[in-house]
């Protein structure tokens, strides 16, 4: 595990995360098996999450091209089965103004139009494939934790609507308290459409099932130990088998085994994100904070929290965490999240937390997704770096990778509708061995700024 950024506890591929999602997975009907013996496939996809499954699904559906998906764990073992279930706009950690300076207004507008299309793509797959998911909400809410934050958010909402053409709404503090919820950190909000919440693991399993029915082979609990290029093609070896493929799609995102190929070394920065969920809340407890919304929500803290009320009235609350990925660090992250949650909603201070889990979100050095072919080997494709908005962005990325394979020649040609800001591989992070440490420093600084801002409110 020397090649991994975090503690080995983050990479226990044979152990499911102890999450609410794993406890309620629905019907696991997709046919999968370990990779045994020597197999052959035109296209091998490393990663059984949304990116890899979407690539395989769209290759089969749109181009009648079959492929093989290989994952070190089970389907949805990584971020695809651990996230908060926000199907919302984002995919970048860069400010819109900076994006416009770098790529131009038209490309940024194209990107956000693609984000809307990505959300609707997820909705279409869920409906078309009859995936057992209760879609919740219609907008993402960003709630202000101070009156100053509300002014900033309102200006941001007007910009996104007037310049980017997004559907936004500005909500006053009183309106929000009456129609959404009330708390100690509620000074109004903004909303942006479309957005909805899902059961993320059920979506991954449903996507795998749909791909499997179209002829995609699913190999699970099959960690790739080596990757070599030969005149016959790429050979991916596991402990009990191998697969020979003409093309490889690298779709592992935050759990990227970057040691397998030097071209991917230090291209990503995985960041721990932790989630806690309560027991189902009683109606009287919901009334204590006048909770009325099922929209996915984030707050305006520097170290953003994300939260939503689930269909069974459990409350999900998440945020970024600073640790080495060991169990002691995880416990500290969960305790910190619970402390913040119960500070914001004090009437819930005695509500029990029933599930706690964590995983990775994936950043790139340019703070936008990284999608395409390797310049030095166009038979290798990749898609990663969704910055905490992977449900829709990774599904769309898989669709784009399928189009590259199905429609573009083996050069650097990209689909016309793919924005420039996501094309090609991102630059390497500097001082790669120190990535986790300067990340920890950044998170501590953000937490300090959040505390100072609240004390001066």
Locations of regions flagged by a protein language model:
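Helical element adjacent to the flavin cofactor pocket in flavoenzyme catalytic cores
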Residues: 158-159, 187-246
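Rossmann-like flavin
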Residues: 99-210
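Glycine-rich, N-terminal phosphate-binding loop of Rossmann-like dinucleotide-binding domains
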Residues: 48, 91, 252-253
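Active-site substrate-recognition segment that forms the wall
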Residues: 85, 120, 128-136, 224-226, ...
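C-terminal catalytic lobe of FAD-dependent flavoproteins
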Residues: 317, 323-445
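Extreme N-terminal leader/targeting segments of oxidoreductases
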Residues: 1-43, 61-62
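N-terminal Rossmann-like FAD-binding beta1-loop-alpha1 element of flavoenzymes
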Residues: 41-69
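Conserved N-terminal glycine-rich FAD pyrophosphate-binding loop of Rossmann-like flavoproteins
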Residues: 73-110
